[in-house]
Amino acid sequence: MSKTALGKANASVQSARALYLRLLKYAARYWVAFLISIIALVTFSATNTGFLATIKLVTDAGFVNQDSTKLHLLPFMLFGLLAIRALAGFISNFAMRWVARRVVENLRQDTFRRLMSLPVSFFDAVSAGVVTSKLTYDTEQMAGAATKVAMSAVRDTLTILGMVGYMLYLDWQLTLIFAVVAPAMAWYLKSMTPKLRSSGKAVQQTMGEMTKVIEEAVSGQRMVKIFGGGDYEYQRFTKVAGKNRHMQIRLARFSGLNSMVVELLAGVALALVVFYAVGKFSAGEFAAFIGALLMLIGPVKTLTSLNEELQVGLAAAHSVFELIDSIPEVDEGHEEIGRAEGSIVFENVTLQYPSAQRPALLDLNFTVKPGEKIALVGRSGGGKTTLVNLLPRFYEVQQGRVLIDGVDVRNMSLKSLRQQFSLVSQDVILFNDTVFNNIAYGVLRNASEEDVIAAAKAAHAWDFIQQLPNGLQSEIGDRGVRLSGGQRQRLAIARAILKNAPILLLDEATSALDTESERHVQAALDELMQNRTSIVIAHRLSTIENADRIMVMEQGRIIEGGSHEELLALDGHYAKLYRKQFH
């Protein structure tokens, strides 16, 4: 083996060891239950040796020498050993399963906590299905590696040590015959470990892909049905399910080979022992020795199969710990500004997405006064949404500065900064909960019913809420599926109204409403915007004619700015957009 290959192998071993030690730390939190399980396992393993010693004693003293006293004791001795074995087995299994469920819970909590602290860019790059697979399937595999593998390793290792020790006691020379096959077995298992690890990792990846396809197909059912995508989605799922089956079978093949090789090597050892033992032992010693050798095969096979589960668990651990170790949002600011007056300044701001060929925003400079209503218009991809995303720091400025009330947003804590904003986006986000909990969401959860009703009325949502079966306590389904598009939009606006933040971010806030609803909601928004800074993204220019200033964006730059009348008089890009919509 070359030095490079050897270095990689050593690094892989160290990485696996570090992963497993980190995983065991989760189990170590519950060391009392873990210790109880280990003690029970020691007791369980000791009964195996006790059982063989009893067989030897009874065979020699009972069946050979016809000692009736010991023959009468045999049933009680066997029952006692089996009773102790059964009790120890129950305690060890229950205690380890209890620890396993705690480990799964802690892993999921840590993973979800980190998930909630990651930047928006992470969620833009990773699908919900892959994340879901990490939180569900991968954490279960990790728990198995941390508890079941540890439990079986302790139990079977102790059993092997007990059996080998007893065999050495009976005849150390004969025991060495078994030791001859041990190096071959160890070499084979070591050579299989990388294959098991890579197969386990492939299984994790295909599980993530499968969850992703399911999540997309289920959440997009209306689109799937209207465009006849059922067969296409079925083909996608069949393809990824086939990949998963292939990887699972590959893993099973390696595991089966392990078991077969262990059986063959054990058969060689058994044949050699029988060949050399004939005529050298008493009947009891021979029965005990062969019994010990046979009882070795099971634990050795279990340990080899554990290698599969261990490698799958380590592959899962790498996946989950990679997420847990992801860098959270930068939150190094310490300034707390209370309620902002609402001034906004962009100074030489530039941002380019990692995979983009040109900047999304390029050298932006503008100022918004407190209480001013700014409208952003322009063709899709012009940078309007990116600009808005910089204000609450969904993305970080790469060049330049963004200031709120004269304070760089990077110098504020994220909590203080985001308290200044209410957001209504084009993609309305509602949760599978009640109307009340969707309006009084997050930091608003302690709002009174009177305040929620007032916000609903201001958003022209109260009339339809009253008509729901349970009013504010009505469940609205996944992503608000039981409501119309306009109703969902109005709930989102009610949520923004209830927050009563000094700065409003409205991204196509009325795009899903019919003409009558739009008129009512626009009136409510106009009233809400009084004395508040508002930034509105709109394609429907009729909704922003009364804006204090309209900024036209093109390829990340502001190419025009002014009031509605001023821009029409300029007869530039805005005037062309306006004529397209109204003529």
Swiss-Prot record:
Protein origin, superkingdom: Bacteria
Coiled-coil portions: none
GO cellular component, one term: plasma membrane
Binding residue positions for ATP: 378-385
Keyword ATP-binding: yes
Keyword terms, alphabetized: ATP-binding, Cell inner membrane, Cell membrane, Lipid transport, Membrane, Nucleotide-binding, Translocase, Transmembrane, Transmembrane helix, Transport
Database matches in Pfam families: ABC_membrane (PF00664), ABC_tran (PF00005)
Reaction(s) catalysed by this chain's protein: ATP + H2O + lipid A-core oligosaccharideSide 1 = ADP + phosphate + lipid A-core oligosaccharideSide 2
Enzyme class, UniProt record, top EC level: translocase
Annotated compartments: Cell inner membrane
Domain ABC transporter, chain residue ranges per copy: 344-580
GO terms assigned for molecular function: ABC-type oligopeptide transporter activity; ATP binding; ATP hydrolysis activity; ATPase-coupled lipid transmembrane transporter activity
Annotated EC: 7.5.2.6
Bilayer topology annotation: Multi-pass membrane protein
Assembly notes: Homodimer.
Role noted for this protein: Involved in lipopolysaccharide (LPS) biosynthesis. Translocates lipid A-core from the inner to the outer leaflet of the inner membrane. Transmembrane domains (TMD) form a pore in the inner membrane and the ATP-binding domain (NBD) is responsible for energy generation.
Comment on protein domains: In MsbA the ATP-binding domain (NBD) and the transmembrane domain (TMD) are fused.
UniProt record similarity statement: Belongs to the ABC transporter superfamily. Lipid exporter (TC 3.A.1.106) family.
Protein name (Swiss-Prot/TrEMBL): ATP-dependent lipid A-core flippase
Organism whose genome encodes this protein: Methylobacillus flagellatus (strain ATCC 51484 / DSM 6875 / VKM B-1610 / KT)
Taxonomic path: Bacteria, Pseudomonadati, Pseudomonadota, Betaproteobacteria, Nitrosomonadales
Gene: msbA
